[in-house]
Amino acid sequence: MTDAGEATPVAELIASLTRQVPDFPKPGIQFKDLTPLFADATAMTAVTGALARHASGADLVAGIDSRGFLVAAAVADRLHTGVLAIRKGGKLPPPVHAERYDLEYGSATLEIPADGIDLRGRRIVIIDDVLATGGTLAAAARLLRRTGATVTAAAVVFELGALGGRAALAPLPVHRLTCQ
């Protein structure tokens, strides 16, 4: 069966199990809470399988703090690869590789260990739960590339298409399981 044929049931599972939270974390934002999706065994298995197809060929899967860890670890297990946790700033002991990026109001930092893991030449797919503006995923890709890794793609469960995040990642291929 093709990806297109399999995407509809996965997209339906995602839609049925995504909790819409108005005005969170601030007024005017419609937060997409994927917690019920991750807690459902059938849905989590379907999401993991679909993301794993997009990550095939990677020798390491990277997940972004914190919900990206959930799906990245499951995908890495399915692909028999390792998983790399890309952490928010200040969560790892030094030394770290860090990448600062801008948010709507301020900035943030992503970090990975600077020793103990050699990423040079590793083919990495970055996985996260939601693609919004693309700032976090773009920063993660820059961070990994600076270590000598080859970032081959990004894959997300849910894309908020109206926010244009895909453009921030161009020309990196971005795979999504559903879009709103």
From Swiss-Prot:
Localization (cell): Cytoplasm
Protein name: Adenine phosphoribosyltransferase
EC number from the UniProt entry: 2.4.2.7
Matches recorded under Pfam families: Pribosyltran (PF00156)
Keyword flag Glycosyltransferase: yes
Major place of residence: cytoplasm
Family in the record: Belongs to the purine/pyrimidine phosphoribosyltransferase family.
Assembly notes: Homodimer.
Tagged with keyword Cytoplasm: yes
GO molecular function terms attached to this record: adenine binding; adenine phosphoribosyltransferase activity; AMP binding
Record's signal peptide: none
Keywords noted in UniProt: Cytoplasm, Glycosyltransferase, Purine salvage, Transferase
Gene that this polypeptide is encoded by: apt
Gene Ontology CC annotation, any one: cytoplasm
Domain of life: Bacteria
Function of the molecule: Catalyzes a salvage reaction resulting in the formation of AMP, that is energically less costly than de novo synthesis.
Pathway: Purine metabolism; AMP biosynthesis via salvage pathway; AMP from adenine: step 1/1
Catalytic activity: AMP + diphosphate = 5-phospho-alpha-D-ribose 1-diphosphate + adenine
